[in-house]
Swiss-Prot record:
One of its GO terms (molecular function) is NAD binding. It holds the Pfam family Complex1_49kDa. Keywords: Cell inner membrane, Cell membrane, Membrane, NAD, Quinone, Translocase, Transport, Ubiquinone. It is a peripheral membrane protein. It is found in: Cell inner membrane. Its main location: membrane. NDH-1 is composed of 14 different subunits. Subunits NuoB, C, D, E, F, and G constitute the peripheral sector of the complex. It comes from Burkholderia vietnamiensis (strain G4 / LMG 22486) (Burkholderia cepacia (strain R1808)). Gene3D superfamilies: Cytochrome-c3 Hydrogenase, chain B (1.10.645.10). Belongs to the complex I 49 kDa subunit family. It comes from the Bacteria. This is NADH-quinone oxidoreductase subunit D.
Amino acid sequence: MAEIKNYTLNFGPQHPAAHGVLRLVLELDGEVIQRADPHIGLLHRATEKLAENKTFIQSVPYMDRLDYVSMMVNEHGYVLAIERLLGIDVPERAQYIRVLFDEITRVLNHLMWIGAHALDVGAMAVFLYAFREREDLMDVYEAVSGARMHAAYYRPGGVYRDLPDAMPQFKASKIRNEKALAKMNEARSGSVLDFIDDFFTRFPKCIDEYETLLTDNRIWKQRLVGIGVVSPERALQMGLTGPMLRGSGIAWDLRKKQPYEVYDRMDFDVPVGVNGDCYDRYLVRVEEMRQSVRIAKQCIEWLRKNQGPVMTDNHKVAPPSRVGMKTNMEDLIHHFKLFTEGFHVPEGEAYAAVEHPKGEFGIYLVSDGANKPYRLKIRAPGFAHLASLDEMARGHMIADAVTIIGTQDIVFGEIDR
C-alpha cells in the first residue's frame, strides 16, 4: 500500500499576496495547512547596528524605512525615547501636530491595509478607492516635509517646521482642462490645515463606501468569518498588540492606557472585537479610521486657535533658524556642529512605546553619554504577529493563509529591520 505523506509547498517570496518578501514553507495535507513556517530575513538591513554609527538625529530617516507604510509613527517612538533621555519638554503646538500626523499616518496605513487585504481576497475595487484617498494624505506629507513617504518630519524636541500657510496646487497639463483643474484645486486654495480639515470632513463618506462594498458582502464574510480565530488568552500569551489584540476583545490601546503627548486630552473610543477572527479585526480597523477622524478634528480645532513654537528652546538640541543662519556666523557654526557632530545624550536607558497602526511600536535606547546610541532595540509589532501565523493558519485552506497574512497587516521593513 502506498505511503501517504504531507506535501511541502513554498509560498513566496515572489508571491503577490506575500506582502513583500515573506517566505512561508507550508506543510499540507491535501489543501489543508498542517504547519506554516515563516522564513524571515530577506529584507534585513541592519537598522539597529547602523544607528550605532550615526548621530541621534541622523537615525531619524532610518525609522521611516522600517514600516514604510506608517512612517511618522515610527519616528515618533524614536524621538520620544531620545526626549526621555534628554529630559526635555516638547512645545504644546508640536505635540498637537505630532498627534495629528500620527492619526493621518494611521489612516494612511489602514487604507493601504484595506486595499491590499481586499485585493488579496479578490475584491479589486476597494484597492482603487483606498488609493484615491491615500493620494491626498501623501500630498499633506509632501507639503510639510518635502517627501511623500520618508518624511523625517519629527525631530528630538519637536517637529521640523510649523504647518505651511499654503497647500501646493495641481499645475495645468495636457490631460487637464481648466474646469477639471479648478475642481482639483478647490480644497487646496487655503493652508495645509484647511486641506486636512477638508479631507477629514469628507473622509467618513469614503469609509461608508468601503463598508458598502465589503461589510455585508456575502463573499467577503465567507472568506473572513471564523478564519484565524485567536482567543483573548492566547492573544496575550503570543504578544499580539494593536488591532490584532483588540480584535480578540481586549481593550488595550497605549493612547488610552499609557497616554503620551496630548492623547489624554482627546475624546475617542477604543473599538474591540468579540470573536477574534479576521472579520472582527477588519471591523476594528475600519472603526479605528473613524476614531482617527475624531482625534484629527480635535487637533485641527486646537491648532487653529493656538499659535506657538514647534521646537524646544534648548539650543543644544534645536537647530538655529534659517534666517539666523544667513545673517549670523555663530548660528551657521552652531548649525554645522549640530548636524555633523550631533548633540550628546546623558548616560542612561529609556523605552518609549507608541500606538502604531499595527500595534505597540517600541524603541529601547541605551546611551553611554556619546553623540550616538550605544544600543538601539526596535520592538516591531509585526514580528510577534508573524510568529502567531503558524497557530492561526493550522487547519485552514491555502487560500485562507492569504486572508490571515492580510489580517495581520504585515510589512517586512519592520520585521526584518
